[in-house]
Amino acid sequence: MASTKDEVVRMSVDEYWEDIKDDYLIQLANTDPNEVYPSNNPGPTTADGQINFECHCVGHLVGSPCGFEFREAITCQKTNSDGEIEQGACGKELMSFMECVTRTQCFGTGDNDKK
């Protein structure tokens, strides 16, 4: 019995570049992105200067095996001045994060072949 979970649809290059015919898709294509995504993700920092841990740019770090250590290190960095950081603030947190990365190899390429 064939699975009905997935369906492969093939189209030619010409079909791909044809005008959109579906009314809903036409409406969606002509909609302002801010209306489609009303909670547009602002990036790594929110408007009030807080850390946006939901940003796609840090989401993989937060969700990694070293996510706790990452959050500790970045929170420390954001709550201390450049001068305090130069004086050694956040060193413990950063080292804890780096030790976790080294220990778990959570940012490896997934390529097990030795070169």
Swiss-Prot record:
Domain of life where this protein originates: Eukaryota
Domain CHCH positions: 63-108
Gene3D superfamilies: 1.10.287.2900
Keywords assigned: Disulfide bond
Motif (Cx9C motif 1): 66-76
Keyword Oxidoreductase appears in the UniProt entry: no
Molecular-function GO terms, alphabetical: protein-disulfide reductase activity
Name of this protein: Uncharacterized protein F42H10.2
Species: Caenorhabditis elegans
